[in-house]
Amino acid sequence: MENNFQVFRLISENFSEVSHSIGLNSDFLEANVLNIMLLLFGLIYVLKQFLGSLLTIRQEKVIFAISECEERLQQANNRLLESEKQLEQTQLVITQVLNDAEITAQKVRQSILDKGKIDVEKLIGASKASIVVAENQINQQIKQKITALAIQKVSSQLKAQVDTTMQAKIIDSSIIKLRGDI
């Protein structure tokens, strides 16, 4: 402590040499340093309770705010977990819907292919029937044409071979046959 006084004394002496208007009194009792320190300690003691209660109130508010934030965080985490569960369920539903849609599309495609096969088979059957009918009609027409040509050829040959005497013989034989039948 003695060293401190000496330091103050040196500073005040040096400082007083530099500036005569400002001075440092090294006597504690005259300088009221002791009074200021007592006042300061008294203020600290009195204000300790006041500031302590203010700090306690502030601490309680901070703790309450932190607990509210933690509660909100917990609620947010719960909502997040619930949302994740809903997302998983939604993804499962989407997957199921996509699978069902794919199965339905395959069934529809197979149904269309089966119906197309049946329609093609019907068309083939109808085409075959049409071909058979057309062949029969063509065969009939060919037979009629051949018959007509044969009759025409025979009649032209008969006309060329049959003269008047031959016609008379045919007429006579036909008359005789008719008499015999009667």
Curated annotation (Swiss-Prot):
- Add the further remark from the entry: In plastids the F-type ATPase is also known as CF(1)CF(0).
Recorded GO MF terms: ATP binding; proton-transporting ATP synthase activity, rotational mechanism
Q: Which domain of life is it from?
A: Eukaryota
Does the record carry Chloroplast as a key word?
Answer: yes
TM region positions: 33-55
Identify the keywords attached in UniProt to this record, alphabetized.
Answer: ATP synthesis, ATP-binding, CF(0), Chloroplast, Hydrogen ion transport, Ion transport, Membrane, Nucleotide-binding, Plastid, Thylakoid, Transmembrane, Transmembrane helix, Transport
* Name the record gives this protein: ATP synthase subunit b, chloroplastic
Top-down, what is the taxonomic lineage of the species of origin?
Eukaryota, Rhodophyta, Florideophyceae, Rhodymeniophycidae, Ceramiales
Main location group: plastid
- Homology family: Belongs to the ATPase B chain family.
Assembly and oligomerization: F-type ATPases have 2 components, F(1) - the catalytic core - and F(0) - the membrane proton channel. F(1) has five subunits: alpha(3), beta(3), gamma(1), delta(1), epsilon(1). F(0) has four main subunits: a(1), b(1), b'(1) and c(10-14). The alpha and beta chains form an alternating ring which encloses part of the gamma chain. F(1) is attached to F(0) by a central stalk formed by the gamma and epsilon chains, while a peripheral stalk is formed by the delta, b and b' chains.
Q: Coding gene?
A: atpF
Q: Name one Pfam family in it.
A: ATP-synt_B
Purpose: F(1)F(0) ATP synthase produces ATP from ADP in the presence of a proton or sodium gradient. F-type ATPases consist of two structural domains, F(1) containing the extramembraneous catalytic core and F(0) containing the membrane proton channel, linked together by a central stalk and a peripheral stalk. During catalysis, ATP synthesis in the catalytic domain of F(1) is coupled via a rotary mechanism of the central stalk subunits to proton translocation.
From the Swiss-Prot or TrEMBL record, state where the protein is found. Plastid, Chloroplast thylakoid membrane
What is the recorded membrane topology of this protein? Single-pass membrane protein
What does the entry list under GO cellular component?
chloroplast thylakoid membrane; proton-transporting ATP synthase complex
What is the native source organism of this protein?
A: Antithamnion sp. (Red alga)
